[in-house]
Curated annotation (Swiss-Prot):
Chain intervals for the UniProt region annotation (Disordered): 1-22
Main localization (coarse): cytoplasm
Name of the protein described by the UniProt record: Peptidyl-prolyl cis-trans isomerase
Record SUPFAM superfamilies: FKBP-like (SSF54534)
Family per similarity comment: Belongs to the FKBP-type PPIase family. FKBP1 subfamily.
Gene that encodes the chain: fkh1
Membrane-spanning segments: none
Superkingdom, taxonomy of origin: Eukaryota
Compartments where found: Cytoplasm; Nucleus
């Protein structure tokens, strides 16, 4: 249970986000059946947020800090670290495992 990270391409191996850092990333989220439910790539605009302060699903708050600047990874997030029994009406069914392809583009003002 939780979040599992599979590295697609390595980052710099030195800079990792800490709670409270502002991160910039691209992501594509899919269900285990392959259905895409969200993508910053498709919108053409990276996602900017604060990591580790409870603004995001737990799987991101715990998975993204394991990535170094510039890294591309696949995060597999179990329902208890995602949207749980509520799901996200219209997009994510209850108790869904989520798959995210994530690229960490920046931590605060430091870019990959």
């Amino acid at each position: 249970m939780g979040v599992e990270k599979q590295v697609i391409s390595s980052g710099n191996g030195q800079d990792f986000p800490k709670p409270g850092d502002r991160i910039t990333m691209h992501y594509t989220g899919t269900l285990t059946n392959g259905k895409k439910f969200d993508s910053s790539v498709d919108r053409g605009s990276p996602f900017v947020c604060t990591i580790g302060v409870g603004q995001l699903i737990r799987g991101w708050d715990e998975g993204v800090p394991k990535m170094s600047l510039g890294e591309k990874a696949k995060l597999t997030i179990t329902p208890d670290y995602g949207y749980g029994p509520r799901g996200f009406p219209g997009l994510i069914p209850p108790n869904s495992t989520l798959l995210f392809d994530v690229e960490l583009l920046a931590i605060n003002d430091k870019k990959a």
